[in-house]
Amino acid sequence: MKVFLVTCLGFAVFSSSVCVNINILQQIGYIKQQVRQLSYYSQSSSSYIVVKLLPNIQPTDNSCEFKSVTQYNKTLSNLLLPIAENINNIASPSSGSRRHKRFAGIAIGIAALGVATAAQVTAAVSLVQAQTNARAIAAMKNSIQATNRAVFEVKEGTQRLAIAVQAIQDHINTIMNTQLNNMSCQILDNQLATSLGLYLTELTTVFQPQLINPALSPISIQALRSLLGSMTPAVVQATLSTSISAAEILSAGLMEGQIVSVLLDEMQMIVKINIPTIVTQSNALVIDFYSISSFINNQESIIQLPDRILEIGNEQWSYPAKNCKLTRHHIFCQYNEAERLSLESKLCLAGNISACVFSPIAGSYMRRFVALDGTIVANCRSLTCLCKSPSYPIYQPDHHAVTTIDLTACQTLSLDGLDFSIVSLSNITYAENLTISLSQTINTQPIDISTELSKVNASLQNAVKYIKESNHQLQSVNVNSKIGAIIVAALVLSILSIIISLLFCCWAYVATKEIRRINFKTNHINTISSSVDDLIRY
């Protein structure tokens, strides 16, 4: 008895609901690549981050004057001044100018936007709406500036307004402040200049799009990651509550920032962070597959199945995920993009090879091998598979669609001149002999489809010709059938007439015989009566 492993992410309950048989699919060139958890997200709330761009430096015993800080402050002012002016033009349009627009009671400086799309105007509305919180946070600028903590919560009463962050302060606190009294002023100034220069380079990279228009160019969280530096995990943890790791959320780009205020005197920047609401569907898995060519019916073919499958319990759907954000372990979507699979496709996913459909390929570059967990799955009938250690050619039999090469078969493998080191064993316990009918192979290439359509048209024309001939024959058969029906009806009527005549004759014969018998009895009685009368007279 053959025993094989069915790697299945769900459990079959109904006959039309089956689980994915990854081992069988691998043997026909359909290889599982990645499994991700499906989550849905929507932008629902906001948080604020105060970025403190000028660090606090403790006074030294030598009363050093750091020229690098003065130069850094001057350069930073030149960088932030256009941003501050642009925000002020959008948030506070001139009362004497008529070129401003109101959206739901909010005044927006249209001239500052330039040529803006609907999405950009929406961003400007968001910027204006955030000014109330920005002013409340700016009112506490002195306390923010006085602290030398890298992460500092800005609170008004018991309500947290924002998180004050200074990435460069973390470097100053951990490295520079411990050496202030042990080095000369020149050495400290050079070290500080190096740190501030690197940080300024990152700021220039992050805010370069903002120099054009902050309302039209939101800051991605990847750029904020450079801005926040080592404080990024702490900020994400403080602003977003979810079981998903901060790295997954940041790499997906679900959080975006927008500059809503710049305080030039204190070198502080208030950034509004759009925080998503994330809901994970616990039993929904999105499986990515990688298709390679296979040797089917003496030709190179490829299986016709979608590259991405959604499996919820024991049901499968095609899942393009065109508008989703993918990370290593999660896929974030705003809505469900599932598409229905045919019953044949579901049966094929379950390992029923007779339900699979393949498409022949010729004259085109195809994926003919893939690395899988330290092994190689290759179509060794369409490319040269040569094992170098030990040295021997790898042959793929006709009844195998692909060949799985693991450490037991080869240590160093060459595929058309490319060398690979095999480091793992395959977890497939056996290779099934495949039997695939010719009807399971269809053409999907445009040229092949045109050729097949020409054949179909020729067949249809021949079919029309045969149909006309058969119609003519049927018409002849119909005429003869009418004559035959009349003859049969006449014969039936004649037979019925004969039968009725015979029955009438039999009835007449029996009736005549009965009448004669009655007459005979009557005459006999009359004779006896006459004899009795004669006897009485006598």
UniProtKB/Swiss-Prot annotation:
Glycans are attached at residues 56, 73, 182, 352, 427, 433, 457. It holds the Pfam family Fusion_gly. GO terms for cellular component: host cell plasma membrane; membrane; viral envelope; virion membrane. Residues 508-538 are cytoplasmic. The chain crosses the membrane at residues 487-507. Gene3D superfamilies: 1.10.287.2480, 6.10.10.110, Head and neck region of the ectodomain of NDV fusion glycoprotein (2.60.40.1690), Newcastle disease virus like domain (2.40.490.10), YojJ-like (1.10.287.770). Keywords: Cleavage on pair of basic residues, Coiled coil, Disulfide bond, Fusion of virus membrane with host cell membrane, Fusion of virus membrane with host membrane, Glycoprotein, Host cell membrane, Host membrane, Membrane, Signal, Transmembrane, Transmembrane helix, Viral envelope protein, Viral penetration into host cytoplasm, Virion, Virus entry into host cell. Residues 20-486 are extracellular. The record marks 102-103 as: Cleavage. Residues 1-19 form the signal peptide. InterPro entries: Fusion_F0_Paramyxovir. One of its GO terms (biological process) is fusion of virus membrane with host plasma membrane. Disulfide bonds join 324-333, 348-356, 380-385, 387-410. Class I viral fusion protein. Under the current model, the protein has at least 3 conformational states: pre-fusion native state, pre-hairpin intermediate state, and post-fusion hairpin state. During viral and plasma cell membrane fusion, the heptad repeat (HR) regions assume a trimer-of-hairpins structure, positioning the fusion peptide in close proximity to the C-terminal region of the ectodomain. The formation of this structure appears to drive apposition and subsequent fusion of viral and plasma cell membranes. Belongs to the paramyxoviruses fusion glycoprotein family. Homotrimer; disulfide-linked F1-F2. Interacts with host LAMP1; LAMP2 and LAMP3; these interactions promote the cleavage of the viral fusion protein F. This is Fusion glycoprotein F0. It comes from Mumps virus genotype B (strain Miyahara vaccine) (MuV).
